[in-house]
Amino acid sequence: MARHKLRIVAVGSTNPVKIEAVKEGFEKVLGAVEVIGVDVISGVSSHPIGLEETYLGALNRAKNAFEKVQCTYAVGIEAGLIKVGEHYIDIHICVVFDGVNETVGLSQGFEYPKIVAEKVLEGIEGGKIAEEISGIKDIGKNIGLIGYLTDNNITRKDLCRESVIMALIPRMIKNAHLY
């Protein structure tokens, strides 16, 4: 029996939440893949502010992962805060890069607690603040602040997976002619 080679997807992170979200998102949309997480530099602050900085972090992660791993696709996921009125909304941006083209997707967003947003704006990484509030060590590699705030009804993996699926929309065969 002939063995088919799985498409390899590199993830610009070693965070198990991001790696599993990429695997689930790709398999739901494009079928079986082998996912490899690699440590890369995002080139942005530890907690990006604004769509552009967050997007740039995801793009850098994807491109840097593509350079490190022989793969079909490379994925970068970056969480960041966007200001809406006087509120700060946490979103995840995913970039899928194939060596030539990139596609982009965003997760749904949620309002960051004011006390957390203020500390992030002072330069403190959101994950550290979330650990203090929740008492959960490495919360960003687990349920995330969203998981804590929603009693696990929505977790960080859900947001990451959602951003991956959104970034894969242009890569679906039925949609290719639209992009």
Swiss-Prot record:
One of its GO terms (molecular function) is ribonucleoside triphosphate phosphatase activity. Pfam families: NTPase_I-T. InterPro entries: ITPase-like_fam (IPR029001), Non_canon_purine_NTPase (IPR002786), NTPase/PRRC1 (IPR026533), YjjX_NTPase (IPR050299). The keyword Manganese applies. Transmembrane segments: none annotated. Coiled coil: none annotated. Mg(2+) binds at residue 70. Its cofactor is Mg(2+); Mn(2+). GO terms for biological process: nucleotide metabolic process; thiamine metabolic process. The keyword Hydrolase applies. Keywords: Hydrolase, Magnesium, Manganese, Metal-binding, Nucleotide metabolism, Nucleotide-binding. Substrate binds at residues 13-18. Binds 1 divalent metal cation per subunit; can use either Mg(2+) or Mn(2+). Its EC number is 3.6.1.73. It catalyses: XTP + H2O = XDP + phosphate + H(+); ITP + H2O = IDP + phosphate + H(+). PANTHER family: NON-CANONICAL PURINE NTP PHOSPHATASE_PRRC1 DOMAIN-CONTAINING PROTEIN, PTHR34699. Phosphatase that hydrolyzes non-canonical purine nucleotides such as XTP and ITP to their respective diphosphate derivatives. Probably excludes non-canonical purines from DNA/RNA precursor pool, thus preventing their incorporation into DNA/RNA and avoiding chromosomal lesions. Belongs to the YjjX NTPase family. Homodimer. This is Probable inosine/xanthosine triphosphatase.
